[in-house]
């Protein structure tokens, strides 16, 4: 009996097979009973359902290829813009910002790639196994990023991809009644193999290096009662066509990883994006609605378009034949797909399907949030885009920054989402005194804030030398907040009283850390690499908004202390408890001194208090008004923050303010004044 069992599984001999041996092979272990031979499969014609599946796969691949080409074009355009904006020669001046280098200027480093000299602010120190530090300028760093994120590092250039032509459908499918369920339909490969839905990495790794997908798509999986032992990549792509828009949303959760680019020859880039764009829906998904009568061109599908990802404002209603679909509009830059700087986005050759496809239906409103939270094709490195606007109100010395929204932010939490907020700083001299932030929005990668943050006391001089840094961070309740990305804008490029809108990509810049207390005597909480800014030989301590008016009706001077901004931090917590002290000199006794209320733990206090001095107009010209700002401390002397003096002996804006007050009676005149670390008396 044992011999019988063993002989049952023995291979046939090398000699000629007898007729009965061939019959046993057809019914034994070599061929599954009821299976069709390859010859029988090739003689059969594909059904219309199978042709539709194939055509939809081709159409989706065309669309994803177009999206990939547009994405690469945007990366190259960004790189070219950085190259055009160079301001130095790379020898004596920084190649990027044009700052003087050498002993009298900033410290310089040499870029490892281009061998140009850059300052330490425009250079980035990269991690390397070398014993000495390796520096790269931001242009070369961006070029490496483009080379990495486009896949050109593997292909030594951008591959030109030509997809197969769609198959013509000879006959149309009869339309089923509305009440009749969609039964007896051709089962999809996904339903035939519910337990064989490989991950994205498995789909790419199963194909040997250099192997291309087979051109014969007629051998769709599952034509017999059982499929082949392993699924080819072409079959895996075709098995993903039956999912609807809901399957797209739920199939792209936070667990989606990086887009791997396996060495698959010229088709590797397309295969990775096709697999990512068409992940299979779960086997428990409900069957789609009954199909409509088929036209000469296959339907455009019912699923929603991919999420906006890195660049927002992409249309979801344009048909696949539209050359701008799915085009992402970035107002800050012009889209280009031509050859630039050695990189070229390969032109796309559309098949007949693109011209015969009907218009795509807009996705349902309830799916927009899930679509927006889905990944794009370079999800491993994208940081997202930020939309905001800037307005400088010159009359009120007010800079308004309206944070509108962000799209496609990098997921920071374990659920694939983030808790983003935006914070602003003015450079140089970033500190808590000029930090503004929005509220935090929970569990979203596409937050909409619509918040306006205002900087008061921004003069024309500040607009010429300040830079606005806008950072997007993820709030963490149980740890440190995480940095997502940032962008910077030089305020001298902003025209007064003209709102300017921006929609730009966030940059991968490490945020500056606070370096403890650089001035322990003053408790200044400054950021690393940000030195204390000085105007001439006078250290910047903040600004104060003062109003002056001589009232003829009351017969005296009315001094208004409105607010202070960007005060120096005097306490260990990085804040101050400021109040303002007024003194009309020469001494007029106790009635010459006034104090405001104390504002706790703030560097931008708002007082809105007025004080009256009973003095004749003729005597006012001989007086001077001493204004000082103090930090209130309990149990010890108050700390002096800064001050200014208005009067005939003053200079510049201070003298002008005092003169206008004397000249224009009964008229309130407001002016911003810089606080200085001048000689002062102790506060009482």
From Swiss-Prot:
Cellular component, GO, one term: postsynaptic membrane
Pfam families attached to this UniProt entry: C2 (PF00168), FYVE_2 (PF02318)
Protein's membrane topology: Peripheral membrane protein
Cofactor(s) in the UniProt record: Ca(2+)
InterPro entries, per database record: C2_dom, C2_domain_sf, FYVE_2, FYVE_RPH3A, Rab_BD, Rabphilin/DOC2/Noc2, Rabphilin_Doc2_C2A, Synaptotagmin
Location(s), subcellular: Cytoplasmic vesicle, Secretory vesicle, Synaptic vesicle membrane; Cell projection, Dendritic spine; Postsynaptic cell membrane; Membrane
Transmembrane segments: none
Binding site for Zn(2+) 1: 94, 97, 119, 122
Tissue specificity remark: Specifically expressed in brain.
Composition skew (Pro residues), residue ranges: 283-299
Biological processes annotated in GO: calcium-dependent activation of synaptic vesicle fusion; dendritic spine organization; intracellular protein transport; positive regulation of calcium ion-dependent exocytosis; regulation of NMDA receptor activity; spontaneous neurotransmitter secretion; synaptic vesicle priming
Omega-N-methylarginine, modified sites: 223
Protein residues bound to Ca(2+) 1: 412-413, 474, 476, 482
Region described as Disordered: spans on this chain: 1-21, 162-377
Keyword Transcription among UniProt keywords: no
Function: Plays an essential role in docking and fusion steps of regulated exocytosis. At the presynaptic level, RPH3A is recruited by RAB3A to the synaptic vesicle membrane in a GTP-dependent manner where it modulates synaptic vesicle trafficking and calcium-triggered neurotransmitter release. In the post-synaptic compartment, forms a ternary complex with GRIN2A and DLG4 and regulates NMDA receptor stability. Also plays a role in the exocytosis of arginine vasopressin hormone.
PANTHER family: RABPHILIN, ISOFORM A (PTHR45729), RABPHILIN-3A (PTHR45729:SF3)
Record note on quaternary structure: Interacts with RAB3B, RAB3C, RAB3D, RAB8A, RAB27A and RAB27B. Interacts with RAB3A; this interaction recruits RPH3A to synaptic vesicules. Interacts (via C2B domain) with SNAP25. Interacts with deubiquitinating enzyme CAND1; this interaction results in the deubiquitination of RPH3A. Interacts with GRIN2A and DLG4; this ternary complex regulates NMDA receptor composition at postsynaptic membranes. Interacts with SNCA.
Protein name: Rabphilin-3A
Organism of this sequence: Rattus norvegicus (Rat)
């Amino acid at each position: 009996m044992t011999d019988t069992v063993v002989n049952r599984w023995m291979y046939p001999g090398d000699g000629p097979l007898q007729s009965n041996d061939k019959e046993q092979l057809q019914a034994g272990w070599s061929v599954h009973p009821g299976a069709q031979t390859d010859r029988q499969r090739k003689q059969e014609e594909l059904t219309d359902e199978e042709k539709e599946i194939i055509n939809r796969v081709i159409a989706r691949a065309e669309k994803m290829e177009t999206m990939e080409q547009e994405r690469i074009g945007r990366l190259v355009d960004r790189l070219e813009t950085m190259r055009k904006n160079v301001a130095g020669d790379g020898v004596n001046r920084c190649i990027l910002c044009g700052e003087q280098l050498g002993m009298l200027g900033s410290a310089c480093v040499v870029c490892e790639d281009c061998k140009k000299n850059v300052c330490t602010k425009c250079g980035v120190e990269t991690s390397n196994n070398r014993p000495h530090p390796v520096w790269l300028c931001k242009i070369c760093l961006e070029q490496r990023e483009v080379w990495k994120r486009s896949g050109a590092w593997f292909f030594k250039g951008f591959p030109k991809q030509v997809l197969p032509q769609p198959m013509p459908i000879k006959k149309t499918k009869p339309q089923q009644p509305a009440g009749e369920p969609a039964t007896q339909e051709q089962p999809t490969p996904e339903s035939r193999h519910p337990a064989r839905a490989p991950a994205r990495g498995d789909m790419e790794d199963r194909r040997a290096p250099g192997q291309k997908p087979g051109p014969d798509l007629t051998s769709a999986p599952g034509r017999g009662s059982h499929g082949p032992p392993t699924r080819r990549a072409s079959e895996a792509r075709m098995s993903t066509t039956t999912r609807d828009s809901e399957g797209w949303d739920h199939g792209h959760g936070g667990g989606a990883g990086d887009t791997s680019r396996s060495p698959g020859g010229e088709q590797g880039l397309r295969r990775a994006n096709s697999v990512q764009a068409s992940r299979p829906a779960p086997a428990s998904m409900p069957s789609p609605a009954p199909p409509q009568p088929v036209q000469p061109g296959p339907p455009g599908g019912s699923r929603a378009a991919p999420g906006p990802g890195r660049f927002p404002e992409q249309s979801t209603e344009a048909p696949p034949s539209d050359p701008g679909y799915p085009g992402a509009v970035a107002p800050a830059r012009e889209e280009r797909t031509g050859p630039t700087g050695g990189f070229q986005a390969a032109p796309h050759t559309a098949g007949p399907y693109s011209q015969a496809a009907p218009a795509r239906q807009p996705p349902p409103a309830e799916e927009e949030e899930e679509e927006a939270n889905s990944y794009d094709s370079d999800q491993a490195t994208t940081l997202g885009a930020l939309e905001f606007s800037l307005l400088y109100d010159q009359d009120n010395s007010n800079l308004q920054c309206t944070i509108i929204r962000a799209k496609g932010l990098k997921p920071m939490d374990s659920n694939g989402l983030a808790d983003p907020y935006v914070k602003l700083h003015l450079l140089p001299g970033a500190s808590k005194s000029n930090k503004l932030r929005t509220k935090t929005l929970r569990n979203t990668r596409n937050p909409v804030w619509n918040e306006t943050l205002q900087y008061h006391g921004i003069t024309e001089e500040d607009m010429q030398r300040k830079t606005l840094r806008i950072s997007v961070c993820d709030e963490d309740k149980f740890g440190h907040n995480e940095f997502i990305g940032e962008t910077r804008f030089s305020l001298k490029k902003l025209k007064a009283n003209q709102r300017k809108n921006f929609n730009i990509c966030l940059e991968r810049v490490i945020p500056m850390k606070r370096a403890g207390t650089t001035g322990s005597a003053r408790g200044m909480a400054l950021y690393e690499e940000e030195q204390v800014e000085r105007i001439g030989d006078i250290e910047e301590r903040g600004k104060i908004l003062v109003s002056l008016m001589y009232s003829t009706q009351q017969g005296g001077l009315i001094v208004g202390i409105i607010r202070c901004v960007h005060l120096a931090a005097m306490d260990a917590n990085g804040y101050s408890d400021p109040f303002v002290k007024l003194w009309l000199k020469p001494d007029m006794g106790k009635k010459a001194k006034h104090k405001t209320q104390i504002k706790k733990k703030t560097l931008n206090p708002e007082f809105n208090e007025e004080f009256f001095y009973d003095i004749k107009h003729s005597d006012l010209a001989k007086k001077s008004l001493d204004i000082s700002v103090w930090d209130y401390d309990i149990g010890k002397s108050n700390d002096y923050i800064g001050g200014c003096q208005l009067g005939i002996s003053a200079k510049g804006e201070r003298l002008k303010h005092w003169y206008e007050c004397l000249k224009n009676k009964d008229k309130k005149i407001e002016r911003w004044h810089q606080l200085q670390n001048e000689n002062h008396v102790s506060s009482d």
